[in-house]
A protein has these predicted regions:
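Structural signature of WD-repeat beta-propellers
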Residues: 13, 20-21, 65-66, 116-117, ...
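Acidic (E/D-rich), amphipathic helical modules within compact regulatory domains
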Residues: 17, 131-135, 142-163
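Short loop/turn segments that connect beta-strands within beta-propeller blades
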Residues: 29-33, 74-78, 125-129, 164-167
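Extracytoplasmic beta-rich repeat domains
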Residues: 1-12, 35-58, 83-107, 131-147, ...
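Tandem repeat domain/solenoid detector
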Residues: 23-24, 34, 58, 79
């Protein structure tokens, strides 16, 4: 591993996936620690000092990156299979353009959802090459949770949102804990 690790590694039957602070993703053999492959993305000049842990699903490992991207890497060789825009960096300054996926993506069936700081919540269809199912403009660094009806997200101000998991429509919003550093659901 080339730099410090800012997120918990993911452990699966294919090995251990580690994401380092310099935006490198490495698959290590669980038995002896040898490197099976490495994937690297360019690092923006400014990003949050936090990282989303990688997540295994099927034949892929999913990793969120600064710049608002969720990337599906093939477990076999680390090749990017698809890339989904969770957020689109925008603004006049470097600080305005920070749009990082810093919470754990959630997976259920063919759906994977992620959220970005200064970005949005987005859900993708893994069986259709990462096609966007829906997105909502809700910024969060706290995280997501998914059940059989709703996707829950705590926004940057501390409001908790329940969104319809199939359409992204708002079902309810609880804002009684604003500005109290509410955790993810």
């Amino acid at each position: 591993v080339t730099s410090e690790v800012l997120a918990a590694p993911a452990v699966g039957t294919d090995g251990v996936v580690v994401k380092s602070g310099d935006n490198r993703v490495v698959l290590l053999d669980a038995a002896d620690g040898t490197r099976k492959w490495i994937y690297q993305r360019a690092t923006p000049s400014l990003s949050l000092r936090s990282a989303a842990p990688p997540v295994f699903a099927d034949r892929f490992v999913f990793v969120g990156f600064p710049g608002g991207k969720l990337v599906a890497l093939a477990l076999q060789n680390g090749t990017p299979v698809w890339e989904g825009p969770v957020a689109l960096p925008k603004g006049a300054t470097e600080l305005d353009r920070v749009a990082d996926v810093v919470s754990v993506p959630v997976i259920d069936g063919r759906m994977i959802c992620a959220v970005a700081f200064q970005g949005r919540v987005a859900c993708f269809d893994m069986s259709q090459g990462g096609s966007l199912l829906w997105s909502r403009d809700i910024s969060s660094a706290a995280g997501l949770a998914l059940d059989n009806r709703y996707l829950f997200v705590t926004d940057d101000r501390g409001a908790v949102h329940a969104l319809d998991r199939n359409s992204g429509s708002s079902m309810w919003k609880q804002d009684k804990l604003l500005n109290r550093r509410v955790s993810g659901p």
